[in-house]
């Protein structure tokens, strides 16, 4: 029965999974995979298989296989056997052994004869060869992983070792798997060999038959073949290892020992303490080395964990405070004996002297041959040189950052891959030294039980505290004191003396600033020097490590005084006075000593306890550093500029060239001459740019001498590779043909080309397509030429000495052209003119020749002058530009140009005004371009000859044409005469016939000739008719004339043949009847029956012939007309269908709208009712639909205050109600969800209630809104959601973090500031309807009270509100039911309380130009917005102006969107805000102020009318930058808007504003006081007050030149003071003299460079050539003495544009940025911020930089009150008592009562113990003790009626908390604060939450 049960499918699957996941199966699998990694070690094995035969061959094969398996087994064993692993893992050892062995092996194979004559016996030689085969296979297997590295498959076993618990079983099974795979491989090779030997086809080959001994020769040469293969593989693999002798030797700054000594002197304070307690300190040279927090060095934050207080190799033994001594401690392989502890300064100084002598003596002894060959500190491998400005040399990352060690996690022992190595070493050291200390080994179950017990204990304590706080809340004791306050670090509980916020480790975020650098180390040491050291100190680390019992540990920690655990004064965290140092009582001291020495027993031979007092020293470690200080090219140039002796750069940076664009060679005659300091080395006479090569950067900051092929992330996998590719993107690279197996791609390309060709053939008649194709062909040609130019330029760059050769050749060509070739051509031309009896043109030619200028340019094309050469032109390259190039003309013609032509336009003849000289002496348009075709000298001559020949030909042709016409007339006349003669003859014949009929001849044979004559007449007439008709048809020139003519001719021929046949038949018949008798004459006057048939058939053929001719002639036109008629009918029908439907639809909608308006007017009383938060949605529909349906505007002054934001909801439901057939069941889940009731109007609810869709409780809750104080969290959450700028993260990051409804929250409402809405309506009776809102006065008074709150209350409430908002958000995120939640799509349906939100009637005009940037789209998606008019963009998170595809025909629409007129706007008010806050999310769209005062009344149409507001606004936001030519800056700017706390650069860039703006704004506000309501006056006053407060903080005015420098320094002192101060002090250039600035501009530029800003000149494609030409022409004009001629010609050619040329001499940075010339971007320097700051930047969403926090502090309250409803839900009793505190007590997450640290701890501990499936034990106490959770949370009980949701809340961790928890766990539990390691764990960041 049990056997049958095992065959159940479920049991089979589980059995199968168990077998598959077992260690044995995994080991077999990995071992089998390692077989596939066939490396060079297989060469010997296959050699024995191929070559050896007979008995000896069998033995050799066995020995080869045995050696191979033994070698592999040794490799497997070495994984766990440490000595073997160290022996095989040392690269020096393996290399030294491998090189002689390989040499011996090749010598053995090639010189066998040398050994043959010496062999004593055959058997001994045979045994030796067999042993050699065994050794070969064994040793080469050991080399495989080091000298001959195999693939990754061979290392899979090593990787899986650390995941496997049963290690030996895994190793054994993997070896067995490898053995099985090896046996299979060998069998397969044997089968292949047998198949080759037995195959007849191979034997029957012609080549093999021709040579019978080919196989035997091949077998004999097999040894040589295998030797060659082995040699090739060895060379290939060894080539990847740098040669020990040939590698580049770097010049170190000093020997490693000297470096250690300097580091010791600089960073370490060696302190030896005498017996009497006096301290003899050796002071450092520069830095204070005390480990105090206040003197912390500014070390790179990424290396914070490796921060050094270290010595070199001569560092002393770290002193411990325990009195036991180690017998011998090895430090850096040097023994430090116990005598060094017993004596004072004398012994320690002797020890140092002894060690110095020892080091010098052992210098040569410790450097064996291997060390000389292999310098471990040489840059052989392509490692990154990580610079650190704070430390002299770079940190050496020799090994991986991962350290595997066992640690306890979740109560179980697990391997941690990031265990602190120092801690592991320390633990092992203690275990080795304390050999008698054997702690009890706990089993895993005991560990887990103990851990669970402790965890449960702590969780209960937290839960109890939490429940007590909730119970107090339940008793309605609303007090902020209930909330757990923030933990602070204090040294005295009674006095409450806290550590400053800056240094408090419990605080984080904006409070954690930068640790400031203190003064000289002497003063600090004097401050911290301790006069009387305490007699005894306890090491806290030892007390914790050596205590195993938890309860004993608690008792121990209780007995230890907290102050006793502090370190010495130099190491203490707090600056405690001497009086505050507490001493331990004698009894406590004895207890502690007994406790410690019961565990830690010192050397039994020495039981004396030392009475000396020893200070605690910090445990530190030595971080390996490179002994070489390497510099790059930039640092080398800086050193040269500073006139310091600098070494050659060792870091290969990207190829670049310094392009000098301006050199100041003129005498300084300006105002700056006096201030110029002749001794100042920093005075720059050049302006240069760095031009980088367009080649792919193969260097990547590699160090000289290192192997480029060994780089990790950039591989070279082709023989010739143009670009560097990362292996990560190898699948996206275009592979060569032999790598690509994809056939679909070429097929698609062929089919696409074929379809395009067919289409082009169809539309080839259209000229537009032809033009487009021509333009495209031109663009493609231009791209090809540009690519070719770049390739040529890069080729000249890459070749050795190419620039020298090219520059010399160019100079030679220039001289040859100017002074030899062109003068000789002029001489030859004029001599030829004289020989041809023409006047010579010496003066004209010489004038043109003198006009040609050869300007020397830089390699990039920047012009210098004729005589000036660029700097380093031989190495950097040169270009020669020819201005007004001379072109030899056969003659000169003087023609005056017409004056009406525009001289600015380029003419075709002026294209050749400049060119560049090539190496071959040719001319080209652009540098390195293809040579252009020069104007030919003989071309005008040939043209003149052609013209004369043409004239002569025309005269001849005229004579010939006249002669031809005469001959044609003569022919025509002869034809007409001939025709007249023939017609007259026929007429005469007819007369004769008539006469013969009247007078017949009376004899018998005359009757038949008469009939015959009649037949001939008919035939003649018919022939005549046919001829005429054919002539008529022939005269008409139709399209298909040839076809018609051919058919007519065929018919004519056919009828003629029929006639001829009839005539022949008649003639024969006449001949037969010629001799008839006289009897027949009696019936001679009668026509016979046959004649009648003949006559009728004749007529019939004539009719058929005529009809056929007519039909053939008209058939083609009939078909065309018929087709066109069909097309026209179809087209008209298609056009009429939508027109009629549209007309019917418009008429029906008009009727519906009129009925709707009529019904609305009937319900006017219902509209006028005053509600607290709602507006009737029908009036909104009427307004919007009336404007949409273009009803005539009858009264423009009628106004109504309503909320257009409800348009979207109302319009949708209105359309739904109009639908006759609607499936309401689809709306049931939306409408029955309890959250929807908060956002629906009453009318909509009633409508759906009648249809049974929504619940009746919706109306019930809605009806309570006016009766109770509404505390609904849903609306608060929604309004809060709109106001939080923290959740506008970087777009791609936010989409990963937020839940579904957050991804769809893009339809935020835009702001509107005009106070009245002109409502257009069709009814004249409508009047102004004022909605008197109850909350207006309250909100305004709240605004007034808000600024009266002191700073502490503000901070508390903002903090509280912040946590409240986050918890609300997390609660709602748990409870969302559908990703497409209806209210996530909706607009804000609430009416603004304090400010009636209203809009201009032309709604499509408002935000069009604001949307032309990457601004968060939810701020610009109102219902009347331009985006809705142009399409549905609501699914997009961010909006880009490139999406809008404008056509030319839409230009009128665009103009209609923007109202540029200033008429009828007198009554519109404008609130001028100094910082125009457009965004709701507290993001600043910074404002650049106008420098001059503008009078709007005189500038009609100068401002765009956004919402009709901008008549008086003097400031406009910056965001139109993207329409300029700096796209990078706009992207960075938008990213900075979203996260403004990264670098507070806004004070630096945008606030250099004049003070006059404030006065101007205040004056304008006074003018408008009469138009503004009292509450609005308060807002404006507050804004002005804010501006006045802000002015001394951040805005130093650049008003006059005299004040600029002084104000500039004050601005620098105030802006970014905290951020930049320390970094400036530690700048490398801090030892320089202070500059005496010549001008304010130079001071500003130096300021930006000091702040490490990157500024660049960037041009787009549209402005590329324009700006380049202007820069080049400006640089040329600066050098010329008389530049007038060049200026005029440049303007005529269009090279120089006067608009770009700025006439102002001194331009401030703000003006440069405003004009779009300069962009400034702060360089992201990681060394500027400490690790905490970077960590909280990347992880914490809550925290904002303190500068941002201070700036936004004024605007937060105002913006919240003006634009949000967050503070509008105020309790009624608070309104009555004029208490304006916000009500934040509706806590949706009860855990908010706890502090963030305890909240995190509680959640983590709950998740640790979540073993119970029902999950209710966690909340049972909470639910029993608290009366009603819903009352605590909110007054809407239905929000928390579902218990499952509350349980789900407990399991939910909001992503913000999750990120924090993850970071904290990584940092503290696993010692991972590195970003790369942090990303490894990010995969498991969001495990699926189970509903328990």
From Swiss-Prot:
InterPro entries: TIC214
Region Disordered, residue ranges: 256-299, 1613-1636
One Pfam family per UniProt: Ycf1
Subcellular location: Plastid, Chloroplast inner membrane
Polar residues composition bias: residue spans: 280-294
Gene Ontology cellular component annotations, sorted alphabetically: chloroplast inner membrane
Biased composition, class Acidic residues, residue ranges: 256-266
Transmembrane segments: 12-32, 68-88, 89-109, 128-148, 176-196, 225-245, 1115-1135
Domain of life of the native organism: Eukaryota
Record keywords, A-Z: Chloroplast, Membrane, Plastid, Plastid inner membrane, Protein transport, Transmembrane, Transmembrane helix, Transport
Topology with respect to the bilayer: Multi-pass membrane protein
A Gene Ontology biological process term: protein transport
PANTHER family: PROTEIN TIC 214, PROTEIN TIC 214-RELATED
Family stated for the protein in its record: Belongs to the TIC214 family.
Described function: Involved in protein precursor import into chloroplasts. May be part of an intermediate translocation complex acting as a protein-conducting channel at the inner envelope.
Subunit structure: Part of the Tic complex.
Protein name, entry field: Protein TIC 214
Gene that produces this protein: TIC214
